[in-house]
């Protein structure tokens, strides 16, 4: 199963992001610096993480890019990477920015070439004349099928439509041929535009037309930027889909494409599997917890190596230095474990913030009391001055 950002992580990242941006949509380098530097990574590593996450190169991080940066940092701290990766893994690329990543790869000459489907032996009884144009009715039907099989990232895999394949008059080899045609990179999932093209090919094959062997250049480009021009070369010619089907023909007697599948499926069968960037929680202790766990793992590894070394000295003179080091490491390990427990239970240092808040509230109360007393003192002094003036005036009048 491919890795992904879990909803709990997204919730934590969202609270950090929303707190730093005060409800804004972008995080500047100045805003992000305190959070990122708390990870303990070197500045040069953080710079590379920033460049990696800033997919659109606008100098800021939106929420999806911030999630990418945080996940890369956590993976570095947890030992998933020895150093900052040079490119983002495919599963970590935000859906909304996949076209930018593809464009950057194309500029660097890393874009996989579109494969041409090999010519196969022509099947008897199939017709030529495949048309890439989609009528509004067909497009609507394709979108309904897509909605029932997509995951939360808006992508769809081959097996998600297995029930549809069973309802069609299309051989399995042709189904896979159509899939390979619109998925030349052999990805596990495809986006909406590629899915609609895939369903369109299956529709034509279901109606007795041969599967095309190539995809027009305009459609290939559209797949990469997630925008598809369904009317290739802006041709306005009438499509055969604009005319009413003849129910007397063998093709017309077939069930309309996807009708059986959609009727049988129902919308209640939809389950989400992808990363959802809409859920939201916050914890400044995340970095500390990760660091403590990493230190614990390092200490346990050191202890294991020392114990192996001691065991290797069978019958030899026991060196007191490894034993002393082992005791010190065990004590440090116990201390770190206690710190981690206190952190998880909200005890010890983790309560410093709440104590400071209580002291701050007490100080504010004292300030208010002092201000009240000073105000009362001023009013009494004014009364005293008034009495003194009246006494002086009385003396003068006598």
UniProtKB/Swiss-Prot annotation:
It comes from the Eukaryota. SUPFAM superfamilies: EF-hand (SSF47473). Ca(2+) binds at residues 54, 56, 58, 60, 65. The keyword Cytoplasm applies. GO terms for molecular function: actin binding; calcium ion binding. CDD domains: EH. One of its GO terms (biological process) is actin filament organization. Residues 351-363 have a biased composition (Polar residues). Residues 9-99, 138-226 form the EH domain. GO terms for cellular component: actin cortical patch; endosome membrane; plasma membrane. The keyword Cytoplasm applies. Component of the PAN1 actin cytoskeleton-regulatory complex. Belongs to the END3 family. This is Actin cytoskeleton-regulatory complex protein END3. It comes from Podospora anserina (strain S / ATCC MYA-4624 / DSM 980 / FGSC 10383) (Pleurage anserina). The gene is END3.
